[in-house]
Amino acid sequence: MVSAQSDGLRKLGRLLAVLVLALGICGCRRAPAVRPVTTQVVVLGFDGADPNLFSKWAKQGKLPNLARLAQTGSFRPLGTTNPPESPVAWASFATGLNPGGTGIFDFLRRDPETYLPELALVSREKAKFLFGLIPIKPPRVINERSGVPFYKAVADAGYKTTVIRMPLEFPPTPIPGGKLWAGLGVPDLRGTWGTFFYFGTELTPWDVGDTEFGGKLVRLEMNGNEASSVVEGPVDPTADSYRRISVPIQFKVAPEGNAVTIQLGGRTETLAEKNWSDWFRVKFRINPFLSVRAICRFYVLEVSPDLRLYMSPLNLDPESPPLPIAYPANYTAELVEKHGLMKTLGWWHDTWALNEEKIDEGLFLEDSFRTMQAQAEITLDELKNDPPSLLVSVFLATDHVSHVFFRLLDPEHPRYDAELAAKYGDAILQSYERMDRIVGDVERAMKPGGTLIIVSDHGFHTWRKGFNTNTWLVQNGYMTLKQPGVEDKAYSLEHLFGQGSFFPNVDWSRTKAYALGLGQIYLNLRGREKFGTLEPGPEADQLMEEVRQKLEAFQDPDTHQAVVQKVYLGREIFHGPRMPEAPDIQVDFRDGYRTSWQTALGAIPSGIIVANMKKWSGDHCSSDPSDTQGIFLSNRPVATQDPSILDVAPTVIAILGVHPPGHLDGKVLEFKPPAAIK
């Protein structure tokens, strides 16, 4: 009987392997390009590049390639979306639609049935298993961005297209005859935006657990010169209750105390202090027939007297990703064959580990610039060795470096440090200088007569203080608590990605409005929210106007200066088929202020204004678009004086002579005719 069962399991395993292989083969098919490459357009995105910083450093001669483009071609501040958040703006960049058309209004959205936040970029359907063993329904991930990306329209028209690290392309859009590698939005294997691990012997039992934003702190207890622990990976899809699948990890300190040996996933590597490991491949077994793989690497922060190690997030293995991250499916495997193993996580630079002060500024910059250079090499290789008619490549380093180093440009920031500023005050400039070199290299690699367009999705501001919007709503009578005076516990991203509860102290029967995300307020509408109290129509309209007036009049009690620049009603700034999902109110703050982290996650701390004591010190997410513009440069002069990020899609389509894929909100920018490619 046992033998028969074993034989049956082996046959089932072989059948599943054949099915997986068949799915892989189907995903790897690539239709041939139709048109020869006679016209070339290259679009480079540099997330968060600010027009004021660009202009300042270009005038100082520090950005020679970009300055030359501005003089011989064109430079304009680029209008952005409201709110000027990366996913919102890149969705409009790709489709030429405003957020009411794309359906992307923030990183987060709320479920009106539960009031719980969830990621706005994708929706997920869980896998189903028979007896917890046999997958009878695969997991499904749905890209929530509506609209047809311009690179999809171009590829459909027969133009060879290559897209590298494009935000909001998870899962990726099929690009007939072309290639696409998804960027911002791709999760780690844990299903988060990048959970780093920190292993340390100095941690107390009270230190361990989840950090506010994206970290796992693990205490090591030495047994002689050895320590054992686990790496927690993905949620077990076969379990009835919430639990994560783990794999063991071992550390062994050398007798001399100058190195540590790491054993993980069947691989062993010995590292001295202040050194990076190579990539580790880690397999998490779901059941006897199914496992998923990730890659990660370590940095040894200290060996003695305390053992302290940083471990990168669990990136989906680019050679066998459990979820689609590229089109065709084997594109990232081809890149690995050419360029070696690389990160696949959408949030490419580990801002969270620096923000939680588990790595330092130097280590963050080393890793970020190495990652930026890897993307530059891939971009140049595609241009030189497999040139397409359209290439799009979006870099994130300019944004991520700005987020965590803006404090060193702002002596008034609570985390300004003169000593650190002397050492790392040029960190943001360094990211711009690398941007400049990439632009020069790309321009030289392009076909003669091609069109080069450089864009950023938004600019930047210092962020000195956070605004607890839900606390303001409580104090102004728009939200009622079950237990007034009882402060919420601090929330973390694990609550969002895990099994946390939100708004546990809110009395929905007496609440009129609630805040979630980075600047959004929702009315507790009857007929829409599960426990709605507010009647749609005049009652709701009156409340929104009242909230607008009070927020715009609110002053910082320390400075007596206005905090909010402008409050918009959703119906004033959004239009399109996804309007039912839009926030009712969008709050845009003045320079120096932003929605607090805890408001973004749905918490209700005690005070309204809180000092920003984090290294994440620059932001844009709930700023006003009028003073948070991005940049637009091109090697061709442009006549249009007020370009918008919505204009890029129709402009590229027009240059290549492609019919627009339906209505677009953006306009075609007026260029001089491109020179013919010889």
Descriptions of predicted regions:
Residues 2-16:
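Bacterial N-terminal signal peptides that target proteins for export
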Residues 24-27:
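C-terminal motif of bacterial Sec signal peptides marking the signal peptidase cleavage site
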Residues 34-36, 52, 365-391, 407-454, ...:
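A long, amphipathic alpha-helix that forms part
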Residues 37-39, 46, 60-61, 71-72, ...:
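Secreted, luminal/periplasmic, and some membrane-associated catalytic domains
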Residues 52-56, 79, 138-140, 637-639:
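Second-shell loop/turn segments in exported
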Residues 65, 92, 546-553, 612, ...:
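Generic recognition of well-ordered alpha-helical segments
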Residues 358-365, 417-428, 532, 633-638:
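Glycine- and acidic
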Residues 593-640:
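Low-complexity, glycine/alanine/valine/leucine- and proline-rich hydrophobic stretches
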